[in-house]
Amino acid sequence: MKEVYFIIPEFDKSITGGTLYDNNLVLELKKLRIPIKEVRVRYNINVILLHKKINKIPKSSTILIDGYLVNKLRTRVINRLNILIHHPCSMEISNNQMSNINLYLSERKAFNAAESLITVSKTMKRVLQKYLGKYKNICVAYPGIDKKFCKQEIDRYSKNILSVGNVIPRKGYHILIEALKKVTEDWTLTIVGNHEMDKTYYDNLKRLIIKNEMQDRIEFKGSMKPNEIVAEIKKSKFFILLTKYEGFGMSIAECAAAGLEIITTDLPVLREVLGNYPVDFVDLRDPDNISNKINEKLSRNSVNGKNKDIFYTWSDTAKKIKRFYEKRIFY
């Protein structure tokens, strides 16, 4: 069985959906006796250092690299190269991959050079196919939902709204604050997620909150452990995330599995992931409708969330990847 070297970016104190996926995948592949070795690098590693790391990996082994890093690949990798893509970096700011042409071209080159790709949803698979010049094997392996999130008791009398996601423009917190201006019901908002990733954006949000006199209503909790997030779920009425783009939407899926009702953006991937959960899909261009949806949920002393069984575990994720790659990279 070939050794697999998994190159993983680390984001200091930030916990991203991609980080959770990578870490859980490593744990579960090891349980399946896959000889996987971790190569952890800083998220902002430069091109030269990344290639030095790669050059130290035995040429007979296989490389699995997180797609966040592949735009830094400048020369051909001798090893068999496989890429795990949560979503392309060229779509981080806009859902038009051509908005950053240089980033798009570097990712396109890397995706096409890879032996195969792994991604997290069928929607993302269709997105990646647009980057490819020819057919390529793409494995879709949904993220697992940690059991601790499932089947929670929700406080139907709560007036607290929960939002989970790092404080970056793509998550749409500025849109949420604007929508809350027109909410007439009593409310508070808890935001869970690292607010040091984009200090300019965070400072702008704080100014917007002060301008609208919402300081006593909105609390930024920073990054939290899963058990701490579960505690926030139990204290909240519903979940909202007005995200502009997602590869999967792990925090949304976790809160839906817990039993919270959901308000989120009408994106194809979120319709795929959330299935039959009670979700209000909204158009970010219609803030009045968003305000109305928030008012509607706050005014009811009931919760329509469904406590569904986990549809995918991290063990399932690893087994799916193992089956896909058994004759490709592990042997």
Residue ranges and their predicted role:
Residues 20, 159, 166-182, 200-203:
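A conserved mid-protein helix/loop that constitutes part of the nucleotide-sugar donor-binding site
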Residues 98-117:
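Membrane-proximal helix-turn-helix segments that form the acceptor-binding/catalytic region
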Residues 123, 144:
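Carbohydrate-associated surface elements
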Residues 188-206, 222-223:
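Glycosyltransferase donor-sugar binding loop
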Residues 223, 231-236:
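Short alpha-helical donor nucleotide-sugar binding micro-motif in glycosyltransferases
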Residues 261-264:
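Short hydrophobic beta-strand element within catalytic cores of glycosyltransferases
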Residues 279-288, 295-299:
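Conserved acidic donor-binding segment of nucleotide-sugar-dependent glycosyltransferases
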